[in-house]
């Protein structure tokens, strides 16, 4: 069975629910009122897709401003970035843009980026609490991200949409690896097919003393 390692980093403002999001996915638990992350926390999850074992390293970074300078340490070499905002907080959506700019500045241009709006359970109970329409997230992604980037809305509390986020990301990671391997294979074949042509004159010159 083949295997693949992938590093995923979660970024976003303090209090948007990144830790609850990760805890729900990794441990299938919801813990309300979790303490704010200090620096970053690290989780592992192993997923089998077809004949490939995908070993995920999920980094949950702190959203407080005082830890922002430490963020590049944690998202270095990441394969995917998940930008999180709270659908009931316009400020958290606006702050997300700073994290996006950091990712674009410090990581390769082909990094997979997804945007996740959290706490949709709150707006189901009280629609007037919503400050960020889903359509606005889609519009933002089409303007700033690659065409295959995705927007999601989830509820860690109700376990809604959490699994689907990572399923889509894993599929993209596997597709990207396959494309990279195919490109590498094609490049090797091209190098092997190159024939150096020379004339008799070249041969005579090369043998002159």
Swiss-Prot record:
Keyword Lipoprotein: yes
Subcellular location: Cell membrane
Residues lipid-modified (S-geranylgeranyl cysteine): 208-209
Entry binding sites for GTP: 12-19, 60-64, 118-121
Alphabetical UniProt keywords: Cell membrane, GTP-binding, Lipoprotein, Membrane, Nucleotide-binding, Prenylation, Protein transport, Transport
GO BP: intracellular protein transport
Keyword Nucleus belongs to the record: no
UniProt-recorded name of the protein: Ras-like GTP-binding protein RYL2
Coiled coil (UniProt feature): none
GO (cellular component) term, any one: early endosome
Protein family according to the UniProt entry: Belongs to the small GTPase superfamily. Rab family.
InterPro entries: P-loop_NTPase, Small_GTP-bd, Small_GTPase
Function: Protein transport. Probably involved in vesicular traffic.
Source organism: Yarrowia lipolytica (strain CLIB 122 / E 150)
Membrane topology: Lipid-anchor
């Amino acid at each position: 069975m083949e295997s693949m390692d992938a590093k995923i980093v979660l970024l976003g403002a303090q209090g948007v629910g990144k830790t609850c999001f990760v805890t729900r996915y990794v441990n299938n638990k919801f813990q309300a009122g979790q303490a704010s992350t200090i620096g970053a926390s690290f989780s592992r999850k192993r997923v089998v897709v077809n004949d490939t074992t995908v070993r995920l390293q999920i980094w949950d970074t702190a959203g407080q401003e005082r830890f922002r300078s430490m963020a590049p340490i944690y998202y270095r070499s990441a394969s995917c970035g998940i930008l999180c905002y709270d659908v009931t907080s316009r400020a958290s959506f606006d702050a997300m843009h700073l994290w996006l700019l950091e990712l674009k500045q410090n990581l390769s241009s082909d990094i997979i980026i997804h945007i996740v709006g959290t706490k949709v359970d709150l707006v189901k109970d009280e629609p007037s609490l919503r400050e960020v329409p889903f359509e606005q997230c889609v519009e933002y992604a089409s303007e700033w991200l690659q065409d295959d980037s995705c927007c999601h809305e989830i509820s860690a509390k109700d376990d809604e949409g959490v699994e689907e986020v990572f399923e889509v990301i894993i599929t993209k990671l596997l597709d990207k690896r396959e494309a990279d391997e195919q490109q590498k294979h094609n490049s090797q074949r091209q190098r092997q097919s190159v024939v150096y042509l020379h004339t008799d004159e070249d041969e005579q010159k090369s043998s002159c003393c």
